[in-house]
A protein has these predicted regions:
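Generic structural signal for well-ordered, non-transmembrane alpha-helical segments
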Residues: 107-110, 114
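N-terminal leader/linker segments that initiate helical-solenoid repeat arrays
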Residues: 20-84, 88-107, 122-130
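Bacterial Sec-dependent N-terminal signal peptides
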Residues: 1-28, 86
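Extended amphipathic alpha-helical interaction segments
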Residues: 117, 125-136
Length: 136
């Protein structure tokens, strides 16, 4: 009987925590860097998660699509966008089938560094010096 009560308490606690986690107010100013309105912010935050998952799963075509959207709509939202973008293009460079593809991916990688430099040049730890050092 005690174990049943314990199991029920844990189950109710888990349901309560999951319900709390879903109530994000995207109109909150702290999410402004993710987009122009609440719907765009929500979608860009999801795109950031999809980008990470696509890179981790080596689905580079999908990852490139998510990265493009994030760089256009919310370039200053998170450093992780650039970390995943750099990972994406470094892997694409290594997998390039010819010199033309390799040059295209190198150009894309340099573009990611340039946009990161514009968005995070004044970051205390990962600012301009760090970015330029990695770009070389």
């Amino acid at each position: 009987m005690k174990s049943l009560k314990l199991i029920l308490m844990v189950a109710f606690a888990m349901v309560g925590f999951s319900a709390m986690a879903q109530n994000i107010n995207y109109d909150d100013p702290k999410y402004a860097k993710w987009g122009a309105n609440a719907e765009q912010r929500k979608q860009n935050m999801l795109n950031n998660q999809f980008l990470k998952e696509a890179v981790d799963n080596k689905n580079y075509k999908a990852a490139a699509g998510y990265l493009k959207i994030l760089l256009e709509q919310s370039p200053a939202a998170a450093q992780g966008i650039y970390t995943n973008g750099i990972k994406l293009y470094k892997n694409q460079i290594n997998r390039a089938e010819n010199d033309e593809q390799r040059a295209m991916f190198i150009d894309s990688l340099l573009y990611v560094y340039d946009v990161r430099l514009q968005a995070f040049a004044d970051h205390s730890k990962y600012g301009a010096d760090y970015i330029l050092d990695r770009k070389v």
